[in-house]
Regions:
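Long amphipathic alpha-helix in the N-terminal Rossmann-like dinucleotide-binding domain
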Residues: 74-85, 104-119, 133-160, 164-172
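Short Gly/Pro-enriched turn/cap motifs at secondary-structure boundaries
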Residues: 38, 173-174
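Short intrinsically disordered, low-complexity coil segments enriched in acidic
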Residues: 1-2, 171
Length: 174
């Protein structure tokens, strides 16, 4: 009975070649990172990323390898933090000083680029956290909707805060 169960359990996991092409995901090896507006190339240790989903291999069942990312340390973290603090510049940096309309334009551009990556993002969600395609698509679409709703809320807040009001004979802009 144990041998039978092991065989049945083993057989429910696909081989890599059994995975439909539209759901296959090439290894992603992220060697670049961004600090202070500069894309840098990491030459240090890497962290391997594996899916919670197992596949059948010649060595038995193994978690599907998804890729790797830089395993940075305190030095890089502090450098990134310093760059972020300098960029913010106590609210006088480029982004915080930018007009609401310009910030919205940048976020919209980001959303447009993100939408072009929808299928890849959906596959990543499927492999990284084991969601179904439908749930991964729903999560992606919900994220886009949330960003768009946030943009609309920021526009409304900006409109409301730009109004003139009159109180007790004093006219002022709020």
């Amino acid at each position: 009975m144990v041998m039978y169960m092991n065989g049945v359990l083993h057989d429910i996991f696909p081989k890599e070649s059994d995975i439909p092409t539209e759901y296959q995901l090439a290894d992603i090896h992220q060697t670049e990172y961004l600090i202070n507006g500069e894309i840098r190339h990491w030459k240090g240790p890497m962290q391997e990323v594996r899916s919670p989903i197992f596949i059948r291999t010649g060595n038995g069942l193994e978690q599907k390898r998804l890729g790797s990312y830089p395993l940075m340390g305190e030095k890089e973290a502090m450098e990134a933090l310093r760059a972020a603090v300098e960029a913010y510049s106590n609210g006088r940096g480029k982004w915080p000083a930018m007009s609401v309309a310009d910030r919205i334009d940048h976020v919209k551009e980001f959303v447009g680029r993100m939408k072009k990556q929808r299928q890849e993002m959906v596959k990543l969600l499927m492999w990284e956290i084991g969601k179904s395609r439908h749930h991964s698509e729903t999560e992606f679409d919900r994220t886009i909707a949330y960003i768009n709703d946030t943009i609309e809320a920021v526009k409304e807040l900006d409109r409301l805060s730009s109004r003139f009001t009159s109180e007790e004979g004093v006219i002022g802009q709020i």
